Each structure stands twice: as structure tokens, then as C-alpha cells.
Amino acid sequence: MTARSHDLGATVAGVHLAFCAMNAPEALSLPHDLRRLVTSRTGAIVLRTATVHPFLHPEFRSLHNPGYDKLVPLVRELVATGGPPVVATIAGANVEEYGFLARAFADAGTAWVEANLADPWVAATVAPFEDPRTLRTLARRMTEAAAVPVAVRLPERTSLPYARVRDVLADAAVRIVVVRNDLGGLEKFVLEAGTAFDVVAVGGIHSGYDVRRALAKGAKAVQVRSALVEEGPGVFARLEREMRMARG
């Protein structure tokens, strides 16, 4: 790694990323698309949300996946390339499934495991933000099961105030929080929850300026969604180039 690549990197929960931008999990889902990220400038490779069993529910298309047992070998393959760190994203029908999935992906070599608590299916099944005890139990189950850092992705709105969410997640030893890159997400969370976590902002990234702006507002790194879908893996090189140009 050169000094010039290092200066746009990030350290998230002790994991070094060569670049502070990575893919959002919903942007790419097929194995061959994820493999293309290995040689890109992305800071990490984030897998599509995985569930215990194959998920094909017609009302929740955002969670469609072949099941964790098909994705664990992909994690091992990607890790073996020596490319960017690999991040697993998981969703469970109950607290036990979150713990099971966290252990399975951590053991496969992921850099951290992200609990997707933002999907409507999770709100309908686990409902982690209706009772802080549920959120605490879920988070603790994951941090106790996984030997790697745990991240929690928050929904657009939570019934619990962010300060309460901070207390619950910090008590459970969660180290990363993923929030929407907007006023009600990133800015409000940083304002109300402080600096207890490494924050990753997702969405709203179309230029190097957008990345710099998110970092200035308190994010450690960003996840790229629509720009990646439109441009492909080359978007990360463009974002990096634009950030360097802005620095002169």
C-alpha cells in the first residue's frame, strides 16, 4: 500500500480499509459481481444480507438470498484472495438466529458482521426497537457469538431515541453503527449519540465531495449504493480520484 492510498483509508472497529468507501449490501448480490470488487478500489466487500434459510418471500424482495450456507464458502473464497476485507450482513427471524449467523460468518473470516435491523421483515418478526430489552439481548447474543466486531444497521426511524439506542448497543459491546446518510440518520445520530461508535453512512454518495461531506459530519466510512449500480466497481476509483483532486 502506498502512502497516497493510505491517506484516504479508514480504520473501522480496528479494521483497516485502504479506502473509506465500500459497497452497500443491497447494491450487489450475485457472486460474480462481488468477485469483481476484489480488484476494485473499494475499501471492503459487503455481502448481501443473509438469512439462515433461503429467503424468497414475495413481500420482502430486499432480503432474497440463497441462505447462509451458500454464502459462507463465498466469504472464504473472497478472504483467500487477499483483497479488501469482507463484511457479512445478516438478518434473523429471532435473536437465536442472529447469534448463529454471527458466529458462522465470523468463523468464515469476515472482518465484521453487520446486523440488518433496517429491513421491514426484521421489524415484523424480531421488532428490536419496540423494547430495549430485545435490542440488548439481540446485540449481546451477536457480540458473544462472534470473535469479530459487530455492527448494527439502524432503520430510517426508530421508536427508541438515539441516545437510548446508544446506551443499549454500547452496553452490548457493539462497535459499529450503520445509518442513512441524511439529516435524520447520520447527522441526528452523531448529534444525539455522540462518538460511542464508528459510524458508517449508507446512501447518498455520488461524488468524492459527498464522501468528504459524510466524513466531515462524523462518519468513519461510507457505503455506496445507486452510483455503484449505475457505474459498476469503477465508481470507487472515480470517488478516490475526485477526493484527491479536491485535496490539490
Label the predicted regions.
Residues 205:
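Short donor-sugar binding/catalytic loops of nucleotide-sugar-dependent glycosyltransferases
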Residues 55-60, 215-216, 221, 226-248:
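C-terminal helical cap(s) of enzyme catalytic domains, especially alpha/beta-barrels
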Residues 1-86, 91-93:
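N-terminal capping/small domains of soluble enzymes
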Residues 35-40, 44, 93-200, 208-222, ...:
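Alpha/beta enzyme core
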Residues 73, 141-143, 247-248:
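Short, basic, helix/turn surface patches
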Residues 23-26, 154, 202:
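Short His-Asn-centered micro-motif
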Residues 26, 50, 118-120, 181-182, ...:
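Flexible loop residues that form catalytic
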